[in-house]
Amino acid sequence: MNYKVTVLGAGLAGCEAALWLAGKGVQVDLYEQKPVHFSPAHKSAGFAELICSNSLKAERLDSASGLLKEEMRRMGSQLLNAAETARVAAGGALAVDRDAFSAEVTRMVESCENITVHRERVEHI
């Protein structure tokens, strides 16, 4: 059976969902409004743009964010793989170079043959 899924937004969740679906053989249309339109918080055209470098938080398994990341790793999270390539020293937190992380996620998504990126703003569903 052939499936096609539309994902709105190339933030963290949208990119993770698109990559996961594409990895399962699903054709994905990913819509991202940047660089056509920017929100007040976003400055770059890249995907998965983080507002601060430590947005991925603690790695300790006794913390909610650490446990969530461990579960995501076990499920094959592509974004956590990207985070490892952009990692910077931050004690017990998973912190990344924001630009390097966004560039890697953008590269991963744009190079995936099952994902078609549409750089346009979606006004209505």
Language-model regions: role of each:
Residues 10, 32-33, 120-122:
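Fold-independent oxyanion-binding glycine-rich loops
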Residues 71-125:
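Feature captures the FAD/FMN-dependent oxidoreductase FAD-binding
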Residues 12, 16, 63, 67-70, ...:
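Conserved active-site and cofactor/substrate-binding residues in soluble primary-metabolism enzymes
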Residues 15, 37-38, 125:
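Catalytic P-loop NTPase motifs of RecA-like helicase/translocase cores
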Residues 19-81:
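N-terminal FAD cofactor-binding segment of flavoenzymes
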Residues 1-13:
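Beta1/beta-strand and adjacent pyrophosphate-binding region of the FAD-binding site
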